[in-house]
Amino acid sequence: MNDVDLISIESTKWDYGWWSADKLKEGTDWRSLEGAWADSTVRHPSLLNLMSAAGATSLKSYATKLKARGINFTVYLLLHDTLDASGNPTGEYGEFNSVKHPDWFSNRLVTTAMGHSADLGNAACVEYLKTSLTDFFGGNLIPTWRTDFEPICRSSDKENRHYKNGSDVMYWCTKGFDEVITHLIENVPGFRYESCSSGGSMKDLYTGTVATVINCDDSANWLSLRTTFYDSSYVIHPAQLQIPVNINSFNTDSPMFWPEMSTSYSGDGYDFHDALIDMGFRSAILGPPMFATFGGGLMREKVAEYSMLYREKVRPIQKSGELYHILPRPDGVNWDGVMYADPDTSADIKGIVFLFKPSDKAGNVKNVVLRGLDPQKSYKLSFEDNTDADCVKTGESLMTDGINVTVAGIGSEIIWITEAE
């Protein structure tokens, strides 16, 4: 919590497993007690240490400290049966289990060593969740719920509002989930919903109406996330497409650096490591970034720099403007890029262009035709890196003839578009 001001944190997330100290199966990270969240007991040793370091003795007291610092608290919570350390259903931790309520749970297993998925076609189960989740999030001052692993069950051997093994299972489970989410929005102050669902599988129009953010994918890799953002943003609003990136995936000093790439370019002032760091962070701020590290090395100054850049410059036009796919889909070889534009905004920035050159094969110069500007106005283009290329052009010229952009070696560029004086 001491890093809050230094790295410009707005939100922090507790992910899978905070409720348990026991792994169900050697060689996996799946844990017991997935459904034992209602008692708000934190059992994971690392998070207990984190709470202790912050001077907190409970989930609520930790949330209170975060709230006092102006930080949103997101807690991951599953709608799965409660299993003990041996992998058997147990009724010792409250009501949400198949021992006490066998009809609340389907025969759907997302993966082995997990509890069966809740069947939200069951009206009694839905009513329990409406009350207990409101108590959990509202009572602990936690504003954001992050779901995962199919909160909306896709199959069930139970018969309730849907048929046993029927084709209407997902319909009624979606209806039940919506009843729960609507209740939380109406009864938990400032409630936010984050959808992960096995790494972004719930990218649909219903989820888009209730989720503040939707996970792009679970790779945690900058190039994969840039690709799924490109694809998903044709349908889902880019301000909702969360980019949860492991910053070591673009750190050339890390064993997690991937994909492997190199350049033959060695011009004055060019640093391959620095170029990859900037390209990775710029990939992450295409949508709402979620920065993480696996294996240490947080790069606090860079996290702070790009967090502020996203918050102050990208997010406003991301919300008010339009996103344009101005170059082909990222493939790790050729130039790719997108741009935001809002010619009618009262803000200074009328557009932002993100360009990426991931290989020497792509060539150093790319002609880029822009979109979404006012053809009758003149615009100043300010390059983040190659400031010698700053220029003034009309919207008509930019959207007809385009502009030539140079990136030597492997790298990226941001172009800020303002109205010319």
Predicted regions mapped to residue ranges:
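Histidine/acidic-residue-rich catalytic or RNA/ligand-binding cores of hydrolases
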Residues: 18, 85-94, 155-161, 202-213, ...
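Short beta-strand segments enriched in hydrophobic/aromatic residues
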Residues: 79, 356-358, 419
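Active-site-proximal substrate-binding groove within the catalytic cores of carbohydrate-active enzymes
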Residues: 138, 151, 177-390
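Aromatic-lined carbohydrate-binding/catalytic grooves of carbohydrate-active enzymes
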Residues: 1-131, 142-144, 154
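C-terminal beta-strand-rich structural cap/linker in extracellular carbohydrate-active enzymes
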Residues: 392-421
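Structured core elements
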Residues: 6-8, 74-76, 144-146, 192-195, ...
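Polysaccharide-binding and catalytic clefts of secreted carbohydrate-active enzymes
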Residues: 12, 17-22, 113-187, 191, ...
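Charged, low-complexity surface patches
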Residues: 55, 173, 273
